[in-house]
Amino acid sequence: MTAPRPVYDVIALLVADVDGTLLTPEKTLTVNAIAAVRRLAIAGVGFTLVSSRPPRGLASLVAALDVKLPFAAFNGGALVGPDLSIIETRRLSSRAASAMLDLLDRHDIEAWVFADGDWRSRNADGPYVAANRRALGFDPVIVPGFEDVIDRVDKIVGVSDRPARLAEVEEEARRLLEGEATVNLSNACYLDVTHPEANKGRAVEAICRLMGADLRQTAVIGDMTNDVAMFEIAGLAIAMGQAPDAVKASADIVTTSNAEDGFSKAVENLVLPRAARRRASL
């Protein structure tokens, strides 16, 4: 029997996923979520984000939550300063990017490519383009192909309204790109492909390194398979209530869903009682 992971009693930093965690299903910040982040600051707990989104798609949240620490975009493919300056990037090789795009084409799955600060698509009316436009706050660049940016791709997303089909492609992509890419569903309809070291576990490690923070005193919260890598290395791993069972099983504790203010409840009930400053004053 595998021994349970130790859960640490002191938390000095919380790193949160965005879509499905910090935001509601309608992609909004609740008043309670904003207040929870403020309470973290008062308690001396650092707060930052790690997301599959591009940096530009996180700018409004960074401003609304007054994030003062480095954060991670593209599942860790980019480390970004709170002023949106790029600290570090890890991009797909041109071979891996080409192979993934060919795979998506063979399965008739829409591809989005993020490169040069833009979101690129070959289809303005493709599945979830309108929804992603609302979430990110900017429009895709419609292009005939991706050849001109193939050597500097930050992320490829396979997009489908057939989740079972996309899950099958996920497994095929992992076999095809083993050692060359990180392949994970960021939700049931989006398959993210990034540099092999661009995952949320590496991102949290890098953020802690930049801050001089202790991983054992770091809490993380998320809802999808791309969050499991950070669950495995943090001192406290929290899964959202609507997360798939396998994701919940990888966490230490489960909060309520993002439709039920699960983020703010996790802060109040799980993180703040472990706040480093509060414990130091006891």
Model-derived features: positions:
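Active-site phosphate-binding/coordination module
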Residues: 26-130
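Short, structured coil segments at secondary-structure junctions
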Residues: 65-67, 74-75, 177-179, 233-234, ...
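Conserved acidic, metal-coordinating active-site core of Asp-based
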Residues: 107-221, 225-233, 242
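A generic structural signal for well-ordered alpha-helical segments
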Residues: 40, 62, 104, 174-176, ...
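Hydrophobic packing residues within well-ordered alpha-helices of enzyme cores
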Residues: 33, 58-62, 169, 173, ...
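Active-site residues of response regulator receiver
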Residues: 17
